[in-house]
From Swiss-Prot:
Keywords associated with the record: Mitochondrion, Ribonucleoprotein, Ribosomal protein
Name the record gives this protein: Small ribosomal subunit protein uS13m
Miscellaneous comment: Present with 259 molecules/cell in log phase SD medium.
Family designation: Belongs to the universal ribosomal protein uS13 family.
Known role: Component of the mitochondrial ribosome (mitoribosome), a dedicated translation machinery responsible for the synthesis of mitochondrial genome-encoded proteins, including at least some of the essential transmembrane subunits of the mitochondrial respiratory chain. The mitoribosomes are attached to the mitochondrial inner membrane and translation products are cotranslationally integrated into the membrane.
Gene3D superfamilies, sorted: 1.10.8.50, 30s ribosomal protein s13, domain 2
Complexes and interactors: Component of the mitochondrial small ribosomal subunit (mt-SSU). Mature yeast 74S mitochondrial ribosomes consist of a small (37S) and a large (54S) subunit. The 37S small subunit contains a 15S ribosomal RNA (15S mt-rRNA) and 34 different proteins. The 54S large subunit contains a 21S rRNA (21S mt-rRNA) and 46 different proteins.
Any one GO biological process: mitochondrial translation
Lineage top rank: taxon: Eukaryota
SUPFAM superfamilies assigned: S13-like H2TH domain
Cellular component per GO, a single term: mitochondrial inner membrane
Length: 143
């Protein structure tokens, strides 16, 4: 039996709190446990044990939270703000290097690869076009 909540399919044997934490971006184990305790589900209740009103209560609870695309947009905006204000972590994002203090002498290849790729709409690299300005060259070289 498959249970559908907000367009996501859950197997019937899955534990509710683990299933919510694994399927929805922005919900971890702690948040999933809080949702279950708020709605009155016991800790290891499985998806196939839910009734239709309980499924609807989970859906209504999740619809009030910032999850999926909204949570990703917030992360993207935070990274863009760090770059814009010129913070150290923003600079590390721009240079495609590890942000959280990891060593880079040997093992930074993964961060370099992942920070260059457009991951779920978070693109970190842009190239500016350099244009020739004759008046600038005349000021520099005095011709």
């Amino acid at each position: 039996m498959v249970v559908h909540i907000l367009g996501k399919g859950f197997k019937g044997k899955e534990v509710i709190k683990i299933a919510l934490a694994s399927k929805f971006y922005g919900i971890g184990k702690t948040t999933a446990e809080k949702i279950c305790s708020k709605l009155g589900f016991y800790p290891w209740m499985r998806m196939h044990q839910l009734s239709e009103p309980q499924i609807m209560s989970i859906a209504s609870e999740l619809s009030t939270m910032t999850i999926e695309g909204d949570a990703r947009a917030i992360v993207k905006d935070n990274i863009a703000l760090k770059r814009k204000i010129g913070s150290y972590s923003g600079m590390r994002h721009t240079l495609h290097l590890p942000v959280r203090g990891q060593h880079t002498r040997n093992n930074a290849k993964t961060a370099r690869k992942l920070n260059k790729i457009d991951r779920r709409g978070i693109h970190t690299f842009s190239q500016a076009k350099v244009q020739h300005n004759p008046s600038l060259w005349s000021c520099i070289f005095g011709k």
